[in-house]
């Protein structure tokens, strides 16, 4: 599971991370990680393999890696000072008609330490979002996806407005763990096929037609750590998520 190179020079490496690849090595992680690949295949021996920021295991897309300690310090400082610009594409439940901003501090869920929630005593978190396209699963397509459902079950889906979705462009202004996922759940528009935050029943329905969480790191902008030049790099939506959009109609 080797990531594609989007850009590289003597100071940095920008990769297109495939879904399913864990970023950081840890005792609890048994599979090969991006950190392992960077140290072995790219001979990057600095801390964390030079990884500047994280992406969740099932999130695909653009990730920034430093090749030197000095470049790592510079890029991490840009994240801390909010110079870096990031954009994600997320397919969410429900119809979102207007752009908005979610400002909600995020902390660990006291009832489940593996999850995060909006908490007054959490760390500051801000996410901007804007609708790209409103989409739906029509009656015929719902029948194709759920052929084993009877009329009562199908009516229940329609009553719950299950077939309504929006493709969002999300711009996190801070970098909290699970930030986009938590914020979209908080405004009642959870990401499609998000096992942690969509809810068990919804997740099971989503998995019938969406193979993984629909969250893709599409774009990143930053100052080059050596030249100071502003750079913007992009990752195309992967084939598995393109197929998901083809299932839906606008």
Model features per residue range: what roles?
Residues 1-250:
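RNA pseudouridine synthases
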């Amino acid at each position: 599971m080797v990531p594609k190179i989007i850009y590289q020079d003597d100071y940095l490496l920008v990769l297109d991370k495939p879904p399913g690849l864990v970023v950081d090595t840890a005792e609890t992680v048994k599979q090969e990680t991006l950190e392992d690949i960077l140290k072995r295949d790219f001979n990057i021996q600095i801390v964390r393999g030079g990884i500047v920021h994280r992406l969740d295991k099932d999130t695909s897309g653009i990730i920034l890696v430093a090749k030197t300690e000095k470049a790592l310090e510079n890029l991490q400082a840009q994240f801390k000072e909010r110079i870096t610009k990031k954009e994600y594409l997320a397919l969410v439940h429900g119809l979102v008609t207007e752009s908005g901003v979610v400002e909600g501090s995020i902390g660990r869920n006291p009832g489940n330490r593996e999850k995060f929630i909006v908490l007054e005593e959490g760390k500051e978190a801000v996410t901007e979002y804007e609708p790209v396209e409103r989409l739906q699963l029509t009656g015929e397509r719902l029948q194709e996806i759920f052929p084993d459902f009877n009329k009562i079950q199908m009516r229940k889906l329609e009553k719950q407005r299950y077939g309504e979705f929006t493709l969002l462009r999300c711009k996190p202004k801070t970098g909290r763990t699970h930030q986009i996922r938590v914020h979209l759940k908080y405004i009642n528009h959870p990401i499609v096929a998000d096992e942690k935050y969509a809810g068990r029943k919804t997740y099971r329905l989503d998995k019938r037609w969406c193979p993984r969480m629909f969250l893709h790191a599409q774009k990143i902008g930053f100052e080059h750590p050596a030249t100071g030049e502003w750079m913007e790099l992009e990752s195309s939506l992967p084939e598995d998520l393109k197929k998901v959009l083809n299932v839906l109609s606008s």
